[in-house]
Amino acid sequence: MADLWLQFLLTIDATLRVATPLILCAMAGIFSEKSGVIDISLEGKMLMSAFVAAAVATLTSSALAGMFAAIGVAIMLGLLHGLASITLRGNQVISGLAINILASGLTVTVGIAMFQQGGQTPNLARAERFRPIELPFAEQLGGIPIIGTIYREVISGHNILVWIALGAVLFTAFMLTRTRFGLRLRAVGEKPEALDSAGVSVARTRYLALIIAGILCGMAGAYLSTAHGSGFVREMTAGKGYIALAAMIFGKWQPRGALLACLLFGFLEAVASRLQGVELPLIGQAPVD
C-alpha cells in the first residue's frame, strides 16, 4: 500500500513537470486569443526558444542567460506574427503555420552549423541548467505520513520555472479580470471598433498581448531544454504547442480551465511514461514505444 501511495505521488510530481511548458504556452495563447489574434505559432515559438536557450546556455554556461535569450527570440517571432496578421492584415493561421515551419527548419540548420551534432546541442552540465529547489526540511518532514510525503515528493524538488508556470496562471487571471489592460484586451478581441472609437489603439493592445505571449513561450522553451532536459534535440517540442492550444480551447479560454486541461494532459503523459515496461493485469507488459 505504501509503495502504491509513493508511485501515485511520483506520478503527480511528474505531472507537474510535464505540464509546465503546456501551462506557460496555454497562458500565452489566452493573451493572444483574447486580443483577437489566433496564435497557431505557439509551437514554433516554443521550439525556437528551446534551441536558443540551450545554445546560449552552452556558450555562456548560464541557464539564466539562455532563458532571457529564449524570451527575446520568442518576442521577435511574436512581433513577426503581429506584423503579418495585425499590420499587414494577413491570414493569422497561415502566418502562425509559417512561423512553425520556419522554426522547425531553422533550429536544425543553425544547430548543425554551430555544433555539428545533427541539429542537437551539446549536453548541458548540471551548473548550466535550472536546478531543482529543495524546500526547507523536505527530508526531515518526509517521514511524516501523507503530509510529509506530499511535501517531500510533490511540492519540493521543482525548479524555478515550474513555480513561475503556476504563478503565470494567477498572473493571467489577475491581468484579465482586475486591470484596465485586461479590460481593454477583452474588448479588443470582442468589439475592436468600440475600443477604437474610445481612442485606444487596437493594434498597440494586440502587440502588447503578443509580447506577453512571447515572454511566456520563451520560458516554456527554455524549460524544455535547460530545466526538464539537458540540451536541445530536433523537434523536441513534439507538438506541445498544439496541445497547449487544445488545452486553452478545452478550458474555454479561461486560465483556470486551461490549467486543469494542461494538468490532465500532463497526467496522461506521466502515466504513460511510468507504465512503460510495467506488467499490467490482463494486458501484460506495457510497450516502451
Model-derived regions, located:
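Membrane-interface helix caps of multi-pass small-molecule transporters
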Residues: F31, A55, L59, L79, ...
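Helix-loop-helix "hairpin" substructures at the membrane interface of multi-pass membrane proteins
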Residues: E153-F232, P255-R256, L260
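Short loop segments and helix-boundary regions at transmembrane helix junctions
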Residues: K34-I38, L77-L141, R178-R180, A238-G239, ...
